[in-house]
Amino acid sequence: MSDYVLAVAAADLPPGQAAEVTVAGQVVAVFNVGGTFHALAGRCPHRGGPLGQGFVDGPQVSCPWHNWTFDVTTGENVAGPDMKVPRYEVKVEDGQVLVRIG
């Protein structure tokens, strides 16, 4: 799939917050970092914790299950690049956050 799909209304995701949404059948975590939106696969690669329900601190999110922390702009684990979460392209049009899966 190469098209962008609606994930969330931008107004519903204030800065410093995350949302867990389903986009094209996949769980996606969407983040607002200072007004810029980012999207990662919604499950932590460690044990499958819900990243969209994690603790957001600037450009980082910590998994609520075991505190693994990822950079939402790159998907990289801050402790080392051996664990990475897939990152998705994001754009905002007409107040809607759109995510491209694929």
Model-derived segments and spans:
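Short cysteine clusters
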Residues: C44, C63-H66
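Glycine/small-residue-rich loop that forms an oxyanion/phosphate-binding "nest" at active or ligand-binding sites
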Residues: P81
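N-terminal pre-ligand scaffold of iron-sulfur
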Residues: M1-G58, D71-V72, E76, K84-G102
